[in-house]
């Protein structure tokens, strides 16, 4: 089966645009491989698209070492799908963005991972070795559970860097 017949839904929450920027860059990368990508904010979720997608990527900012309440609401709203095992066997991944270099982003990825596991999804981590510490380096935060990004206190047009 070709990649062009596969679909990916990226569901994210972004209060100030920084996490939306990360979601958009992930979508652009996936589209380059020929995968059909659906990008949606948690406040405008198309449940049918999520149900039909081959893979789901969830993302949100790190707030106080936890997921955003908007993503938590989506998780709770998925209860009927959990009971029906609708997403069982789908690939899943997660990402988070925050102002601090750590800010307990790992806890956010663990929460997203646990949500995916509850649904019987197959988790895909980040396979990239850390390459350095500059804002342009791949996996500069040495995360393997999922993508961690950091934004300075500036507009989403400036930070995080692509």
Say what each PLM segment does:
Residues 56, 76-79, 83, 100, ...:
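Alpha-helix boundary/capping detector
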Residues 75, 89, 126-127, 148:
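Short, intrinsically disordered/low-complexity patches at protein termini
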């Amino acid at each position: 089966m070709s990649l062009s017949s596969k679909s990916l839904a990226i569901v994210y929450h972004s209060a100030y645009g920084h996490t939306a920027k990360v979601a958009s860059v992930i979508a652009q990368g996936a589209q380059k491989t020929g995968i059909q990508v659906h990008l949606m904010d948690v406040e405008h979720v198309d449940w049918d698209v999520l149900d039909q997608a081959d893979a789901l990527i969830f993302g949100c900012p790190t707030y106080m070492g936890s997921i955003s309440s908007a993503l938590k609401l989506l998780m709770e709203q998925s209860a009927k799908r959990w009971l029906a095992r609708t997403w069982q066997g789908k690939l899943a991944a997660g990402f988070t963005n925050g102002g601090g270099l750590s800010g307990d982003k790992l806890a956010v990825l663990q929460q997203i991972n646990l949500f995916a596991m509850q649904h019987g999804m197959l988790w895909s981590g980040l396979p990239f070795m850390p390459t350095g510490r500059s804002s342009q380096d791949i996996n500069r935060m040495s995360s393997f559970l999922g993508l961690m990004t950091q934004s300075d206190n500036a507009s989403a047009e400036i930070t995080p860097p692509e």
